Amino acid sequence: MTQGPNYRIKFRRRREGKTDYYTRYTYVINNAIRFVPRLTNKYVIVSVSKFDQKGDIMIAYAHSIELVKKYGWKGDTNNTPAAYLTGYLAGLRAVKSGVKAAVSDIGLFVPVKGGRIFAVIKGAIDAGLKVPVGDLGKLKDRVNGSHISAYAQKLKNENQELYNKLFSSYIQRGLDPVLLPQHFEEVLNKIKENGGK
């Protein structure tokens, strides 16, 4: 476990893989408002927060379960379209709260091109929040779930048994996965009409 007399134990939250203290320190020094997307095995959680000595102040918050409860989302709550919609919802709420720009804080996630983290950020940018980030062109075709729809169509034609197994949760909720892009547009329009409330 230890490696001699000079071994230094890392902070608990760093050991648990929760906090990157070096990056957090730079945000605190710059007094930056942070756009914080987090992915779990089931959900996407997004918050817009700023530093305070007593603890971070939450300016805006969105959880992907809200998509199901408030807007009738029938897809998964942690896939790319759900990540985009959750980011869009958080972005709308942040803009309503008076935040114009924020810095993305992806924590200890490894940035991967076309990943869900960047789908969340793209959603916030499309909602009107300025978040400095590189090229998100690869996400254009993925945020509405067309890649999921194409795969579902392929499986439906080739292997019906595997299709029923992989997309059982979609079918159980009453959504044909081939129609996911249309359902995405419906939910996005509901969020726009509601104004992110």
Curated annotation (Swiss-Prot):
The keyword RNA-binding applies. Part of the 50S ribosomal subunit. Contacts the 5S and 23S rRNAs. It comes from the Archaea. It holds the Pfam family Ribosomal_L5e. Keywords: Ribonucleoprotein, Ribosomal protein, RNA-binding, rRNA-binding. Gene3D superfamilies: 3.30.420.100. This is one of the proteins that bind and probably mediate the attachment of the 5S RNA into the large ribosomal subunit, where it forms part of the central protuberance. The gene is rpl18. This is Large ribosomal subunit protein uL18. CDD domains: Ribosomal_L18_L5e (cd00432).
